[in-house]
């Protein structure tokens, strides 16, 4: 089971938490999900140079709080906060609610699975050999302290006639261990030969009970 499912989804409520945290009345749920999807899509497109890892959304009353995790927060904030103010106005028009934006810096982008996946995809689009791009991502993550890394690419690799899947792994990857802190990222590279899917798994160590309680005191 651990080999097949999204490793973050499998660990929700154990060592991982939800990216959208809100409660909706009956009839509003679908609307909020659609809104969340639109917000994430808009921010990812507008801030793609900033290296967006993930976007957490919280709602309370007429207020929407967005927590944006970025590798380059300076691009999001802009000079004297000009960019973030403009962004806030655009988002408030979209959701018709007050929007609060909190920018969090991703201190080690080499250990963030989503950013590693996007970096590998960018190299594939620039026609870097897929094996070299994958091995480069793995060695970089291991150098920064990952206990295990697995990168998988699927599609017409190297312009081959028949699509196939290749993967490389270094270190441990205990997908069945629920207390294992495994980060997962997925993206697609649009090459001249077609779309290549890139999946990245990064194992950062095991989260013990005391660590979980410290991170989530209400649990």
Swiss-Prot record:
InterPro entries: KH_dom, KH_dom-like_a/b, KH_dom_type_2, KH_sf_prok-type, Ribosomal_S3_C_sf, Ribosomal_uS3_bac-typ, Ribosomal_uS3_C, Ribosomal_uS3_CS
Residue stretches in coiled coil: none
GO cellular component, one term: cytosolic small ribosomal subunit
Listed Pfam families: KH_2, Ribosomal_S3_C
Domain of life: Bacteria
Domain KH type-2: 39-107
Key word RNA-binding present: yes
GO molecular function list: mRNA binding; rRNA binding; structural constituent of ribosome
One record GO biological process: translation
Record keywords: Ribonucleoprotein, Ribosomal protein, RNA-binding, rRNA-binding
PROSITE patterns with a match to the protein in the record: KH_TYPE_2, RIBOSOMAL_S3
HAMAP family assigned to the protein according to its UniProt record, in alphabetical order: Ribosomal_uS3_B
Cited PANTHER family: 30S/40S RIBOSOMAL PROTEIN S3, SMALL RIBOSOMAL SUBUNIT PROTEIN US3C
Binding partners and assembly: Part of the 30S ribosomal subunit. Forms a tight complex with proteins S10 and S14.
NCBIfam families in UniProt: rpsC_bact
Functional summary from the UniProt entry: Binds the lower part of the 30S subunit head. Binds mRNA in the 70S ribosome, positioning it for translation.
Family named by the database record: Belongs to the universal ribosomal protein uS3 family.
Protein name: Small ribosomal subunit protein uS3
Gene label: rpsC
């Amino acid at each position: 089971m651990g080999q097949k499912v999204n490793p973050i989804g499998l660990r929700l409520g154990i060592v991982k938490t939800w990216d959208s945290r809100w409660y909706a009345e009956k009839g509003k749920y679908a609307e909020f999900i659609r809104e969340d999807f639109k917000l994430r899509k808009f921010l990812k497109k507008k801030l793609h140079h900033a290296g967006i890892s993930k976007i957490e959304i919280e709602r309370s009353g007429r207020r929407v709080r967005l927590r944006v995790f970025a590798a380059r927060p300076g691009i999001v904030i802009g000079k004297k906060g000009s960019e973030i103010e403009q962004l806030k106005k655009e988002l408030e028009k979209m959701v018709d609610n007050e929007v609060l934006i909190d920018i969090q810096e991703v201190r080690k982008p080499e250990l963030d699975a989503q950013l590693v996946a996007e970096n590998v995809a960018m190299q594939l689009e620039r026609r870097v050999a897929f094996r070299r791009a994958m091995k480069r991502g793995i060695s970089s993550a291991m150098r920064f302290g990952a206990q295990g890394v697995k990168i998988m690419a699927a599609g017409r690799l190297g312009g081959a006639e028949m699509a196939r899947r290749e993967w490389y792994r270094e270190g441990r990857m205990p997908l069945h261990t629920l207390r294992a802190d495994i980060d997962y990222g997925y993206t697609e590279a649009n090459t001249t030969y077609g779309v290549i899917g890139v999946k990245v798994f990064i194992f950062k160590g095991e989260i013990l009970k005391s660590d979980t309680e410290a991170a989530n005191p209400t649990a």
